[in-house]
Amino acid sequence: MLRALLPPLAAGLALTALPAQTATAASTLTNGGFEADGSGAATPSGWSEYGATGASYTESGGRSGSHRLSHWSSSAYKVETYQYLSGLANGDYRLTAWVRSGGGQNAAYLALKNCGGTEQRTDLPVSAGDWIRIVVPVRVTNNQCTISVNSDANAGNWLNVDDLTFTPGTSGLAVKGADISSLPKSEAKGGVYRTASGSAGDGVALLRSAGMNYARLKVWVNPADGYNNKARVLAMAQRVKAQGMKLLVDFHYSDTWADPGKQHKPAAWAGHSYSQLKADVYQHTYDVLGALKAQGTTADMVQVGNEINGGMLWNEGSTSNWTQLAGLLNSGYDAVKAVAPSTTVALHLAEGGDLGGTRWWFDNAVSRGVRFDAIGLSYYGYWHGTLHDFQTTLDDAAARYGKPVFLAETAYPFRLDSEDGLENIIDLTGELVPGYPATTAGQTRWMNDVASIVEAVPNGRGLGVFYWEATWTARTGNGWDPADPASGNGWENQALFGYDDRALPAMSWFSHR
């Protein structure tokens, strides 16, 4: 634990509930960096406390200054550190704070309340070592607001908060989506999708009712099983749009999976020259998107390639030949805009916690004139670094390239055991992200916390989040290998429907503001 040792004063304070300590109201946030009193202040200047007040105090080890606010006690505790603001002009405001937490609390969150409307909260992500920036937006309608830091904690649980600001502005996610490419084949193999109470329903409609507003569909050129091709995407697009959702089309430019480890050309393009491949990319992209537009389901966003860290259409489009890769990417971009100029074109990399790799890739792309509108990153916490790494990379990409950014893929397990005959990809406790157990609560917390990090991207450039393969439940014949009907899934413990086919609590993240 990186929490500094308790100063003698704080260590000796009683941890029983005391009468609320109330500071004088002001119209601007006071002492948001907790520097006014030094270490050991039980009631920081400008702030008030309620509950086990001895568990709330300032100590050394601030993020940008010398001190921070901490909550901690050797026994279970509930405490609120708050500041009341009055005389505010009505309008939209945003609380920004840097936080750390060892996790384990029953609740640990920042809140804006008594502002004239519904209380707004953001939970603290689990991050024991590095500071994470989070935001809480609110609309003030009664000229006042209370800023609140809350802990409902077990013995030894701790949090740190520092560098709070309360400024005009707002935040939220435009994209609350999921990849549901697996759904048609699952349904064909007998897959059933149910509400949390057990009523069977349409998988797309169930996700929409939970708050999902964007669907991601991958498209392969000529897959062995006949799924995820143009015809299947067209059919799914009609279902998506009928539910009032937007559509992202994810071009793999392959007959099968394309990712950092493999970017195989479609069999029909195997012998083509580089100039032919540029034409292939344009024609395939235009063909699929044109057909979508013709049936009234125009794509709202398009990925030109999937997890293209090493390029696409190997070897001609490898990053070992950036000039050729740039030409292929621009062919895709041109095709998208020829069909619908308003469609957003995104470039998508894996390893969302790799700041250096992301900079290297996009610096090369920009220097060669690659055109794009948005940046998508995959981030799986059990593979791609800490939440701090992800936030640093996401923030940097948005600022460095001046583009909106989004989380193109993430997921988390709600259990570790397998429902089919194939060992799950994540099936050991040691593979999990600390503070996020493989439970329905752990899965829910993961999604809310990564959504909060995307929401906190400065200047409103955090577009949103796509959950990867929400509907990929275990069904015989719907495994990883499109050429092998006997292949297993390996992902059913990270779907958003449980082994009883019921909607899981993690779907609540679709209602993230």
Annotated model-derived regions:
Residues 115-144:
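Extracellular carbohydrate recognition and processing domains
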Residues 42-46, 79-81, 103-114, 145-149:
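Beta-strand acidic-aromatic groove motif in beta-rich domains, primarily in extracellular
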Residues 34, 135-164:
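Extracellular beta-strand ligand-recognition surfaces/modules
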Residues 203-204, 338-344, 357-433, 440-444, ...:
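Glycoside hydrolase catalytic-domain groove-lining segments
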Residues 27, 33-76, 202:
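Extracellular glycan-recognition surfaces and repeat-rich motifs
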Residues 229-234, 259-372, 385-394, 400, ...:
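Active-site cleft segment of glycoside hydrolase catalytic domains centered on the general acid/base Glu
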Residues 34, 79-105, 134-138, 163-164, ...:
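Extra-cytoplasmic beta-strand recognition segments
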Residues 188-192, 392, 396, 415-449, ...:
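Aromatic-rich peripheral "rim/lid" segments of glycoside hydrolase catalytic domains that contact
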